[in-house]
């Protein structure tokens, strides 16, 4: 499977075309819109979330709530477009009209794609860069992830994302009774944190950063349960599942690091304290005594829960902007201020969930069949049976 996204932050709409989704999958616009609503929540979001009430429209590839096997086109309209029709329109404009535009940007913001993108594509107006590099694009990535999650749910595979840390505040209570319990608690938390007390401190940290004109980052975790053994490959570097998952997480705006299981903590431990002992269970078959490696060994799933974490840097758009240089005058200047969040970590956990779900679904569909969801389900069950009887 693959998908492409198109659209600018203040353009008329965002679009994604998804190819390779198996036929027969039950999906509705409500399924997708549920995920889009989750992305828009979270303490620390900016005023843009009050303007946009994202609703996806299925334009092709689905008939009577069943996928056809043909490309699926999804569209999300931007409500704010009506205020940007002249500035962001596709029609040509005169030189006088271009000069009159007050929203041309020649002052790159530190930490953004503005300057590098402007140099790469020779844009004197850096709005041409920031409109596409905006995290607004993750809207349709979450929409694609919603389709992936529907595929996984058909196969008994569950995905949940939550927040482990915001700023210096870390969740202490992280042991959940079930993935459903984790989902239930985090959906009720304004910061998507399982630890209620830590969640309150996280909100206070966000409020403090906002009051200071600053921003704040954090760490999110995604759990995947119900995976059959052997998804991925040890044969080639580019087929290793952890490699693909790492790339997916790091492709999310502002993410700067990724780890699996105990992750970087493994550097300070002996091997006996890192690797997971193999045990035999009459009901489950081969399993592990621990899950320090996060459900992945040799680029393949072990059958244990996949545990992947990503670190998100603080959003670089600040209300007390850092110094920059005007590309026209070459004079130092305080960077321009665009409407932004003070903290997007809670929303980022939803985006990370979607990104991980997509890579997992893609790997499963590729390995167990491409065309029909019923055939894929049958093949997955056969693999589960094989691993129990091996």
From Swiss-Prot:
EC number: 4.2.3.5
Pathway: Metabolic intermediate biosynthesis; chorismate biosynthesis; chorismate from D-erythrose 4-phosphate and phosphoenolpyruvate: step 7/7
Entry annotated with the keyword NADP: yes
Binding sites annotated in the UniProt record for FMN: 132-134, 253-254, 298, 313-317, 339
Gene3D superfamilies: Chorismate synthase AroC
Cross-referenced InterPro entries: Chorismate_synth, Chorismate_synth_AroC_sf, Chorismate_synthase_CS
Cofactor: FMNH2
Described purpose of this protein according to its UniProt entry: This reaction introduces a second double bond into the aromatic ring system.
Pfam families xrefs: Chorismate_synt
Similarity section: Belongs to the chorismate synthase family.
Keywords noted in UniProt: Amino-acid biosynthesis, Aromatic amino acid biosynthesis, FAD, Flavoprotein, FMN, Lyase, NADP
GO molecular function, one term: chorismate synthase activity
A GO biological-process term: chorismate biosynthetic process
GO CC terms of this entry: cytosol
Subunit structure: Homotetramer.
Source taxon at top rank: Bacteria
Catalytic reactions on record: 5-O-(1-carboxyvinyl)-3-phosphoshikimate = chorismate + phosphate
Record gene name: aroC
Cofactor binding summary note: Reduced FMN (FMNH(2)).
EC class: lyase
Name of this protein: Chorismate synthase
Binding residues annotated for NADP(+), in chain numbering: 39, 45
């Amino acid at each position: 499977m693959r998908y492409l996204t198109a659209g600018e932050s203040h353009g008329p709409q965002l679009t994604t075309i998804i190819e390779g989704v198996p036929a027969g999958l039950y999906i509705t616009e409500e399924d997708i819109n549920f995920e889009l609503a989750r992305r828009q929540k979270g303490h620390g979001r900016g005023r843009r979330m009050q303007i946009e009430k994202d609703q996806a429209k299925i334009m092709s590839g689905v008939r009577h709530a069943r996928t056809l096997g043909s490309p699926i086109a999804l569209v999300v309209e931007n409500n704010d477009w009506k205020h940007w029709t002249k500035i962001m329109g596709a029609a040509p404009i005169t030189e006088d009209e271009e000069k009159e535009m007050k929203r041309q940007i020649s002052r790159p913001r530190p930490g953004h794609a503005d300057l590098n993108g402007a140099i790469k594509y020779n844009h004197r107006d850096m709005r041409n860069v920031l409109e596409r590099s905006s995290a607004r694009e993750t809207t349709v990535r979450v929409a694609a992830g919603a389709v992936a999650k529907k595929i996984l749910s058909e196969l008994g595979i569950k995905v949940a994302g939550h927040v482990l840390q915001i700023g210096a505040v870390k969740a202490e209570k992280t042991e959940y009774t079930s993935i459903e319990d984790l989902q239930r608690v985090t959906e009720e938390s304004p910061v998507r944190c399982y630890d209620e007390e830590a969640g309150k401190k996280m909100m206070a940290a966000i409020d403090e950063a906002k009051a200071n004109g600053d921003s704040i980052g954090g760490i999110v975790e995604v759990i995947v349960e119900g995976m059959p053994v052997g998804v991925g490959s040890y044969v080639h570097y580019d087929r290793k599942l952890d490699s693909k998952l790492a790339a997916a997480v790091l492709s999310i705006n502002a993410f700067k690091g990724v780890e699996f299981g105990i992750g970087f903590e493994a550097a300070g431990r002996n091997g006996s304290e890192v690797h997971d002992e193999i045990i035999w269970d009459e009901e489950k078959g081969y399993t592990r005594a621990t899950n320090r490696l996060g459900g992945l060994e040799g680029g393949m799933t072990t059958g244990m829960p996949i545990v992947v974490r990503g670190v998100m840097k603080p959003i670089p758009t600040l209300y007390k902007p850092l110094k920059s240089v005007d590309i026209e005058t070459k004079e130092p200047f305080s960077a321009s201020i665009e409407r932004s969040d003070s903290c997007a970590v809670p929303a980022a956990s939803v985006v990370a969930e979607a990104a991980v779900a997509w890579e997992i679904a893609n790997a499963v569909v590729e390995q167990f069949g491409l065309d029909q969801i019923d055939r894929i389900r049958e093949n997955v069950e056969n693999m589960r049976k094989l691993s129990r009887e091996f």
